[in-house]
Amino acid sequence: MRVIGTVGMPGSGKSEAATVAANAGIPVLVMGDVIRQECRDRGLDPAQHHGRIAQALRDEHGPGAIAHQSLPIIEDHLTDATTVLVDGIRSDVEVTTFRDAFGDDFTLVHVSAPRELRKARIEDRDRPGDTDGEPLDAREDRERGFGMDDAIDLADVRIENTDSLDAFHDAVRDLLAADTPHTEVPDNHD
C-alpha cells in the first residue's frame, strides 16, 4: 500500500502529476473535489465559492477537515489498488492526518515551480476559477494561511517542475514506479 500526496503552490503542477498517475491506472483523490462537492451540497457554485467553502470547512470542523473527509475515499480506493495519489494537500495538519492514518506508507511530494512560471501556467490553462475570480496573490495568501508552507516543509520528496512537460511526466512516473515510497526523485532540470 502506498498513499502519495502532493503539495505545492497554485500552478506548480499538482494536477498534472495527478493526470500522470491516473493515466497509469492509479486512483486519484483530488482534495479540491471534496470542497467542490461541499459547495454543491450547500447550493453554491464551486467556481465562485471554492475558497470561501474551503475556509468554512476548516472553521467548522478544524484544520484537518478536508483530509478527514478524504480518508474514507482513499481507503475505498485502496481496496482495489495498491497506490493512491492525493492531489492538493494544503496544510501540515492534513499531512499529519495522512501520516497518522497511513504511517510510513504515506509519502508527501512537493511539486515546485517559480512564481512567474506558475502565474503564466495559470493564465494559459483556462481552468474555471483560475483567472475570473480570486487573484493569484490572494489565493496564495489564503493557501499559506491554511499552512501550505508548513506542509511543504514536511515533504519527503521534491519534484522541480521547471523543464518540459515530458520531463515532468518522467519525474512523476519515476516516483510512482519507485520501490520505496520515500525514494528521492532528482530534479527534472539541468
UniProtKB/Swiss-Prot annotation:
Record region (Disordered): 120-144
Q: Where are the transmembrane segments?
A: none
Residues binding ATP, per UniProt: 8-15
InterPro entries assigned to the protein according to its UniProt record, in alphabetical order: NTP_hydrolase-rel, P-loop_NTPase
Please give the Gene Ontology molecular function terms for this protein: ATP binding
Which UniProt key words apply to this protein? ATP-binding, Nucleotide-binding
Top-level lineage group: Archaea
Which family does the record claim for this protein?
A: Belongs to the UPF0200 family.
The protein's name in its UniProt record = UPF0200 protein VNG_2452C
Organism this protein belongs to: Halobacterium salinarum (strain ATCC 700922 / JCM 11081 / NRC-1)
